[in-house]
């Protein structure tokens, strides 16, 4: 298959910590991997600041977080995408029980949605992680369960409290791993059939690291994390049953001279598990690492200019042939070809031009 669906969330409301809002909201494109042509199929501006999206495996449903700084509580909205007439239809929305809603993840069995709230407190609900059921029609149930993280880290500006930044699920399913930037921890939870979240384990990263996004090796043995605050990338061994993690390796995600003015963002693993890609805001690059399959250790192979500014989010096509970089402050999603043998990226010069892209997801 050479054609895929590309879902894009773009900023459409100003926020004090973002540099402008020039986007529509939620957009859907058809991408031809042979011609590199992207054709817009649908869009809606009815969802506020969809800074993160998850898309069902068949591309029929999309779940969008709304990150609005003035709200004491965020929302997550469900949309249905109909391929036949290329339309987006609103399904429903649910409160996120926390503020600055940062991330979400569809469980591997498709039955639940997990949401992470960065959280600023400020008098509203203050839950860090929330679980929802996904109904047969794709709509979301009311929240099934939630948990709150507590604590702080050594960085007084960014780690004054817990800040859950992302959530994923182990390859075998049933265990969620949450990256909390504020407390330098990865926290694992058992996901109950009824949506309950029971804490299993906590893993502490180096002080001031600021874990943001994580990615799993395809075979589930390793977990990798981009640390936003100290511009490093870490690899850990993972027990998918117990949720236990053990630190293997930490490497700089940018050259030494760039670390002071850089904030790591997203992370992707190639389909064959041999390469890791991490985005650097400030250095405006995509770091390329090879992964030792026996040990999980990382080796830096390259730094590729991101084709714009502020690469907030990355996504690989299902074939692994191309990587998309959502360059927030350049109003474009740059498209790179990828060498499967070396892992290296080449800017194709092609892009999806769209205002303040925050998240890009690609599915068949």
Can you say where each PLM-predicted feature lies in the sequence?
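Beta-rich, blade/repeat-based domains predominating
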Residues: 48-57, 97-108, 120-121, 150-172, ...
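Short, solvent-exposed loop/turn segments at conserved positions within beta-propeller repeat blades
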Residues: 16-24, 68-75, 121-127, 179-183, ...
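Blade-loop segments of beta-propeller domains
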Residues: 39-110
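A short beta-strand motif characteristic of beta-propeller blades
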Residues: 39-45, 89-95, 151-158, 198-204, ...
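Blade-level signature of beta-propeller repeat domains, shared across WD40, Kelch, NHL, RCC1
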Residues: 329-337, 346-364
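Short loop/turn segments immediately following beta-strands, especially the blade-tip
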Residues: 29-36, 78-86, 131-141, 189-196, ...
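Loop-centered beta-sheet repeat module
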Residues: 173-230
